């Protein structure tokens, strides 16, 4: 985790030369998910940024970022953002899964390594679908 955070800091330092950072890039890459969840305006970019932070770093850092923005969001948007961040699907958890399951079954480590990325993507979509259900329920 410390390595990922350090790598992100180095990349942000480099992108700072172009007046960019990874959070803004993630905000625009993952903004369509925020739009599909029924968020609007500034909330869409915030949701994209949070999803990107969750995927690249981890959910705790994304929740910390969300806590700084809760005053700006209405209750529905806050619930949608919080539910979309619940889950264990991020890059650091891929390594944990390979390491922990690989110890239990060392001869299948190559299969686990091949499938863990698909499992992470599935976990991201499950979190987004859970947030979509919250979005639908709280429309009324």
Q: Which stretches of residues belong to each language-model region?
A:
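Transmembrane helical segments that form the transport core of multi-pass membrane transport proteins
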Residues: 1-70
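C-terminal transmembrane helix pair
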Residues: 54-140
């Amino acid at each position: 985790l410390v390595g990922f955070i350090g790598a992100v800091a180095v990349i942000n330092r480099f992108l700072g030369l172009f007046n960019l950072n990874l959070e803004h890039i993630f905000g625009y890459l993952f903004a369509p998910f925020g739009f599909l969840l029924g968020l609007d305006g500034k909330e869409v970019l915030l949701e994209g940024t949070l999803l990107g932070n969750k995927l690249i770093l981890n959910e705790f850092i994304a929740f910390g970022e969300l806590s700084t923005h809760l005053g700006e969001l209405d209750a529905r948007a806050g619930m949608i953002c919080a539910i979309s961040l619940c889950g264990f699907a991020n890059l650091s958890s891929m390594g944990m899964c390979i390491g922990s399951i690989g110890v239990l079954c060392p001869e299948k480590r190559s299969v686990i390594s091949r499938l863990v990325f698909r499992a992470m993507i599935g976990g991201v979509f499950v979190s987004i679908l859970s947030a979509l259900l919250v979005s639908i329920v709280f429309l009324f």
